[in-house]
Amino acid sequence: MSWQTYVDEHLLCENEGNHLTSAAIIGQDGTVWAQSANFPQFKPEEITGIMNDFAVPGTLAPTGLYLGGTKYMVIQGEPEAVIRGKKGPGGITIKKTNQALIIGIYDEPMTPGQCNMIVERLGDYLIEQSL
């Protein structure tokens, strides 16, 4: 299965009638493995900031999480495993696997819990596959 298939079928799938607005699978070095057509263009330093927060949880909390120039307020995640952010009625979930970052961005009517479930389910599967 291609990485694009994972994005299209597992991240952009419908969940209770809702779906993510954009999603991507990105290598921990910032290379894009696959992404939705409307995934924001991000800067390398934004991925570096995310990776630094996984290494030392809490580093993004004072400044916020940036992706594609959009600032998200960092909310409760799972140290070294999941970073969650909120911006208005939407937000972002980032799950770290052995080799990649699974990123889902949502807006209403999708809920944070639905986004978390979609992103983390795929991330957990990839971890089980040693990816």
UniProtKB/Swiss-Prot annotation:
The keyword Cytoplasm applies. It is found in: Cytoplasm, Cytoskeleton. It comes from the Eukaryota. GO terms for cellular component: cell cortex; cytoskeleton. InterPro entries: PFN, PFN_euk, PFN_sf, Profilin_CS. Signal peptide: none annotated. One of its GO terms (molecular function) is actin monomer binding. Keywords: Actin-binding, Allergen, Cytoplasm, Cytoskeleton. Belongs to the profilin family. Occurs in many kinds of cells as a complex with monomeric actin in a 1:1 ratio. Binds to actin and affects the structure of the cytoskeleton. At high concentrations, profilin prevents the polymerization of actin, whereas it enhances it at low concentrations. By binding to PIP2, it inhibits the formation of IP3 and DG. This is Profilin-2.
